Amino acid sequence: MMGRIESVFAKKGKSAFIGFTVAGDPDKETSIRIAKALIDGGTDILEFGVPFSDPVADGPTIQRADDRALASCTTPDTIFAIVREVRAYSEVPIVFLTYYNTIYRRGIDRFYLEAHEAGVDGILVADMPVEESDEVAATAEKYGIDPIFLVTQTTSNERMDTIVRHARGYLYLVSVLGVTGARKTVAPEALALLNRVRSHTDLPLAIGFGISTPEHVTTCNLAGADGVIVGSAIVDIVEKNLGNPDAMEQDLRRYVSVMKKAAEQ
């Protein structure tokens, strides 16, 4: 039976729109409303950032979202409750982007079991080298969760082959050197990375870090990307509307709809 993530990428001729939000930002109930708005706008895969006190891969926009979530006492229990409610609302694939310390403190088996029971389809551990991922990857497989990995411009071809052997679902291609955050253009190096990774695997390839406009999406589409990942631009909309959740939902639906339209062209 085809999994939810695999089903998204099986739709030929269309690029998947992967929308990111920090779970629990700015609080549990608003976070659920944000997730539903992203889904209503047309998000193909929903990526929840698990808030962490030292998110080394994230720029200031997402760091502030993490801070808001932690300030509202977001815990793994909160996050799994959010996922359960979103899963009851939609069959859209749900992916976690987390850091290893969160999994370790919960217990690897317990974390993946609870993720599976809540309805999570994939987990990306941002600070886990593939060489140290055997236990996590085996636990993910045990519970039917896709282990997703990052590939960067500095990833060697040899290391890429190792990543490909461990990865399921899709590969997250980091478009720039540095942290997350909106950029003006898609770097030519990102498109070169896409071509290089494509020669190593048939897994779907999604480009993230710095994607924020329909023009960015079109550029990625023309280069042959299977998906685009948008985070900071979404979190920025949340931040600008913290005092007005209704306007926040409306702006999120509108933004995702425009980006989704570009992904389908």
UniProtKB/Swiss-Prot annotation:
Molecular function via GO: tryptophan synthase activity
Complex formation: Tetramer of two alpha and two beta chains.
Protein's recorded name: Tryptophan synthase alpha chain
Catalytic activity: (1S,2R)-1-C-(indol-3-yl)glycerol 3-phosphate + L-serine = D-glyceraldehyde 3-phosphate + L-tryptophan + H2O
One Pfam family named in its UniProt record: Trp_syntA
Entry keywords, A to Z: Amino-acid biosynthesis, Aromatic amino acid biosynthesis, Lyase, Tryptophan biosynthesis
Pathway the protein contributes to: Amino-acid biosynthesis; L-tryptophan biosynthesis; L-tryptophan from chorismate: step 5/5
GO CC term (a single one): cytosol
Gene3D superfamilies xrefs: Aldolase class I
Active site: E47, D58
EC id: 4.2.1.20
HAMAP family in UniProt: Trp_synth_alpha (MF_00131)
